[in-house]
């Protein structure tokens, strides 16, 4: 069986680690929940030498580069791990597409040279250049992190943006997609892992309210919502993400094809 080294054992990577343990793999990881300190260079290099596969879920610095590639990129390249690199990226690399569909052939912000610097898109391209399998993820939800939780906590919002759509994915569907790629030695390249139904965030919030018997939050304009810069940026992008390649190449399909099944499983 394989040995997986994970950089950044967080919410999503933790689910992947659990799934790989179930497949009989050995898993080591950096991060607060891992067994190796990211800054312990000797320990990390030793783990890199032993690992058959490497997965990074570490996001790039907002105004800087990718921490993993900056610290260990040379070691990754020199250790001949090109056929065993995996990276969790974001569908945000596609930028705003005015509601149009995007797939893995759609140029990213970095590839299109759109002028504005985007650390995530640049990291995405850097990992692809190294021969990695790059998983582009939309909005992630799952236990403890869903519209149900936001409604119960009084944090749910409804923003009045007609025709605004987002894609999303259940965290366990990310895990199953990455596991399929790890176990079956998927070809290098980008893979979108999202569900089958891009839709407005309001639609999901309203369904969550119905499931819980809660009243709907007030409908607000973007200005009235007084969102943080990060949250506001989220609403400035509008796209539908195709998952066709992951289905064809990985033999993957989401267990929760829409938010309806996903939220029902979280009740």
Describe the role of every protein-language-model region:
Residues 110-136:
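Active-site Tyr-X1-5-Lys
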Residues 149-169, 173, 177:
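A conserved pocket-lining segment of Rossmann-fold NAD(P)-dependent short-chain dehydrogenase/reductase
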Residues 177-178, 184-231:
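Mid/C-terminal beta-alpha module of Rossmann-like enzyme folds, strongest
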Residues 91-114:
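Active-site "gating" loop of Rossmann-like NAD(P)-dependent oxidoreductase/epimerase domains
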Residues 257-267:
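Amphipathic terminal alpha-helices
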Residues 118-121, 140-152, 180-191, 197:
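Glycine/proline-rich active-site loop of Rossmann-fold NAD(P)-dependent oxidoreductases
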Residues 206, 225-253:
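Conserved C-terminal active-site "lid" loop/helix of NAD(P)H-dependent oxidoreductases
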Residues 49-88, 93, 125:
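NAD(P)-cofactor binding segment of oxidoreductase domains
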């Amino acid at each position: 069986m394989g040995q997986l080294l994970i950089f950044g054992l967080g919410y999503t990577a933790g689910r992947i680690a659990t799934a790989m343990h179930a497949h009989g793999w050995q898993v080591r990881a950096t991060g607060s929940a891992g067994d190796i300190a990211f800054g312990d260079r000797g320990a990390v290099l030793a783990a890199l030498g032993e690992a058959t596969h490497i997965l990074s879920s570490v996001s790039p610095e907002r105004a800087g580069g990718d921490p993993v590639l900056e610290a260990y990129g040379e070691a990754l390249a020199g250790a001949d791990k090109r056929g065993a690199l995996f990276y969790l990226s974001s569908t945000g690399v596609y930028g705003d597409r005015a509601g149009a569909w995007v797939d893995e052939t759609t140029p990213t912000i970095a590839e299109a040279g759109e002028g504005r610097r985007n650390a995530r898109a640049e990291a995405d391209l850097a990992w692809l250049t190294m021969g990695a399998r790059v998983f582009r993820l939309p909005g992630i939800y799952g236990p403890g992190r869903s519209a149900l939780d936001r409604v119960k906590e009084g944090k749910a919002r409804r923003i009045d943006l007609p025709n605004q759509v987002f894609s999303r994915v259940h965290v366990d569907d990310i895990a199953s997609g990455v596991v399929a790629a790890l176990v079956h030695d998927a070809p290098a390249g980008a893979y979108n892992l999202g569900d089958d139904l891009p839709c407005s965030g309001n639609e999901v919030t309203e369904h969550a309210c119905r499931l819980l018997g809660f009243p709907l939050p007030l409908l607000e304009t973007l200005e009235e919502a007084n969102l943080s810069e990060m949250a506001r940026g989220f609403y400035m992008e509008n796209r539908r993400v195709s998952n066709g390649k992951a289905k064809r190449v990985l033999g993957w399909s989401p267990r929760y094809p829409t938010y309806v099944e996903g939220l029902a499983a979280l009740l």
